[in-house]
Amino acid sequence: MKNTSPQPPVSKPRGSSLTRIVIWSQQLLCEVLEHGDLAVDLTAGTGQDTHVLAEAVGTEGQVVAFDLQAEALEKTTQRLQQHDFVVKNVPDDTEIKRAFGVYLVHACHSSVDKIITHPVKAIIANLGYLPGGDKSLVTRPD
């Protein structure tokens, strides 16, 4: 049976196309992820995506976020702690066991297969540079 309930008016999204795609990707992840899942943020940046993933997987889930810049991991830690998440920092060469919580790895996301050996439900990456950070550190294809 077709849903005939009134639909909210469709409005044109504001902001740049990049801003809209980030919001869309976060919404998609929230539709896919369930409490208890394992999710990965390949580029922690300011922690926005990491925070969305942590909310989506809940306290029973696990989020692993990577970044090359210590400044990015500090920003991510601050954002998550403001929302009462406990953050664990992991050395860049340590395999992460499947356990609850948010884990931050100071390493390139290219090491993901050495650090995470369990099935992952969702992965996100905002490639580029850290806003306000060192612009010489940018994700580029090999």
Residue spans for each PLM region:
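S-adenosyl-L-methionine
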Residues: 1-38, 51, 55, 74-121
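A general structural motif
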Residues: 36, 60, 118-120
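Conserved SAM-binding loop of SAM-dependent methyltransferases across substrates and taxa
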Residues: 46-60
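Conserved SAM-binding motif I beta-strand of class I
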Residues: 62-67
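Conserved Rossmann-like nucleotide-cofactor binding loop
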Residues: 71
